[in-house]
Amino acid sequence: MAVCQICGKKTAHGNRVAHSATTTKRTWKPNLQKVKAVLPDGTTKKIYVCAKCLKAGKVRKAVR
């Protein structure tokens, strides 16, 4: 599974708990977007970034 290249956020695992307390496995997936970004060395590359990092401005998007 893909991981956020900025903060390292990835799929979380846990249990779905019913009212009767029975549990089954489930996952929480991060809101990852494939973004064309400018890297620190000046090159552009498509990377996976979570929506939280995009909103915080941690990624400089490449100009089209």
Curated annotation (Swiss-Prot):
A GO CC term assigned to this protein in UniProt: ribosome
Keywords: Ribonucleoprotein, Ribosomal protein
BP GO annotations: translation
Classification via InterPro entries: Bacterial_rp_bL28, Ribosomal_bL28, Ribosomal_bL28/bL31-like_sf, Ribosomal_bL28_bact-type, Ribosomal_bL28_sf
GO molecular function terms listed in the Swiss-Prot or TrEMBL record: structural constituent of ribosome
Signal peptide start and end residues: none
Name of a matching Pfam family: Ribosomal_L28
Keyword flag Coiled coil: no
HAMAP family per the UniProt record, alphabetical: Ribosomal_bL28
Family listed: Belongs to the bacterial ribosomal protein bL28 family.
Protein name: Large ribosomal subunit protein bL28
